[in-house]
Amino acid sequence: MYYGFDIGGTKIALGVFDSGRQLQWEKRVPTPRDSYDAFLDAVCELVAEADQRFGCKGSVGIGIPGMPETEDGTLYASNVPAASGKPLRADLSARLDRDVRLDNDANCFALSEAWDDEFTQYPLVMGLILGTGVGGGLIFNGKPITGKSYITGEFGHMRLPVDALTMMGLDFPLRRCGCGQHGCIENYLSGRGFAWLYQHYYHQPLQAPEIIALYDQGDEQARAHVERYLDLLAVCLGNILTIVDPDLVVIGGGLSNFPAITTQLADRLPRHLLPVARVPRIERARHGDAGGMRGAAFLHLTD
């Protein structure tokens, strides 16, 4: 059995998957915030419960935000303070007496989608998350590409390209990002960015779901806003696709629930690609909230 943990600031979620990659059991517990020992205990107790329930010693994979293993072997995850700065992989491997694998939660999202029954035909899969932030991951032949600093797929921290500034206006604000830079595309293409763009042009502080509801009702202002957003997304994504050239792009995050993102994006891409390039297949993520657990569990399918 394959055990996959999706660990965040508020919850530790475990999913148990069989050899057919089907979810057999799941359980969630709160994430301890202050005690590293309590954090380790929470993970180990879930593993022990799964071992007992299924009568086996399952493999363990963990998806967690941040950098799973820095040069000194410690975790960097500001959202999980109890474990940040600690040698999490080594400690869990020792306590559980098995090989524990860690990866970034965005890579686990992409890995989950790449192992979808329909998507396994594609050698190079790109996951793109349009949610609270913008991120993603790259999967090649069923294995995540992490890079030495685990920042492969941090698409949100690419800067706005020149074509975007031409489209939006040369006086378009280059907003300061949480990473310390200015003009990162996350500030414009995330769910928060989607709402910020609307307020910037129409001076109305609406949230993304409210804007989408107006769009669905045929509101002309909301429709013009969505057209502008999709054009901006196409410009930025065109740069990424020129570098990566994936077979498939799977879009997740809150904005992926808005059908226009996946149905209207492909037609906008050719003008931003090389003439010989082919637009990849673009799909909405298939596995929703279970994606993080799935991808973490499937870290052991990559041997």
Curated annotation (Swiss-Prot):
Role played: Catalyzes the phosphorylation of N-acetyl-D-glucosamine (GlcNAc) derived from cell-wall degradation, yielding GlcNAc-6-P.
Keywords (A to Z) from UniProt: ATP-binding, Carbohydrate metabolism, Kinase, Metal-binding, Nucleotide-binding, Transferase, Zinc
UniProt protein name: N-acetyl-D-glucosamine kinase
Reactions catalysed, as given in the entry: N-acetyl-D-glucosamine + ATP = N-acetyl-D-glucosamine 6-phosphate + ADP + H(+)
NCBIfam families associated with the record: PRK13310.1
Pathway(s) this gene product operates in, as recorded in its UniProt entry: Cell wall biogenesis; peptidoglycan recycling
Pfam family, one: ROK
Enzyme class per UniProt: transferase
Organism, as annotated: Escherichia coli O7:K1 (strain IAI39 / ExPEC)
GO MF assignments: ATP binding; N-acetylglucosamine kinase activity; zinc ion binding
SUPFAM superfamilies named among the record's database cross-references: Actin-like ATPase domain (SSF53067)
GO terms, biological process: N-acetylglucosamine metabolic process; peptidoglycan turnover
Enzyme nomenclature, EC number: 2.7.1.59
Binding site for ATP: 4-11, 133-140
UniProt xrefs under CDD domains: ASKHA_NBD_ROK_NAGK
Similarity section: Belongs to the ROK (NagC/XylR) family. NagK subfamily.
InterPro entries: ATPase_NBD (IPR043129), N-acetyl-D-glucosamine_kinase (IPR023505), ROK (IPR000600), ROK_cs (IPR049874)
Residues binding Zn(2+), per UniProt: 157, 177, 179, 184
